[in-house]
């Protein structure tokens, strides 16, 4: 979010009309560096060996409605339990997070009007990234809840086993 917030700050500076062409070129240079970093993060972020936000052979839905993050054509299956039974796998949607898919390649700070238009693209990208973060957050909470339940179950089983052993010793 911080990079997107910085982009928004740059767009607002561009949209206010007080900057000359040299200043706007500097704003555009910083924007380009931020977009390169967003693309780098999107293409290199991994969980183990699983690429979270990109895959060369994935088909992406790039027909977004502004704020909707492009969904990759597959999910990340996360096994929840100790066995591979059906129902014990959590499928987490994958998203591509890149400047093109977030429509940040449409931003331009070269004049006031383009700067104003860029604010909208950046706000849409912020909303899209928030939705992706919420999706991963929900998956994390699901896994955390499952982990806590399994820990309680394990503790209860150990307590029951201990009680049975104590009973057998007393006999």
Segments (PLM) and residue ranges:
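Amphipathic alpha-helical coiled-coil/heptad-repeat segments
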Residues: 1-142, 163-166
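Proline-poor, low-complexity alpha-helical tail modules
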Residues: 73, 148-171
């Amino acid at each position: 979010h911080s990079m997107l917030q910085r982009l928004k700050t740059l767009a607002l500076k561009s949209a206010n009309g007080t900057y000359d062409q040299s200043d706007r070129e500097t704003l555009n240079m910083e924007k380009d560096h931020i977009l390169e970093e967003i693309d780098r993060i999107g293409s290199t972020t991994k969980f183990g060996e699983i690429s979270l936000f990109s895959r060369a052979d994935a088909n992406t839905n790039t027909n977004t409605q502004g704020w909707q993050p492009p969904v990759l054509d597959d999910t990340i299956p996360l096994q929840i339990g100790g066995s591979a039974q059906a129902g014990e796998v959590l499928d987490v949607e994958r998203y591509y997070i890149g400047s093109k898919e977030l429509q940040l390649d449409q931003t331009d700070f070269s004049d006031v009007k383009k700067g104003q238009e860029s604010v909208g693209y950046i706000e849409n990208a912020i909303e899209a990234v928030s939705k992706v973060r919420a999706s991963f957050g929900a998956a994390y909470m699901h896994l955390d809840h499952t982990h806590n339940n399994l820990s309680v179950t394990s503790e209860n089983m150990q307590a029951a086993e201990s009680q049975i052993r104590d009973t057998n010793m007393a006999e």
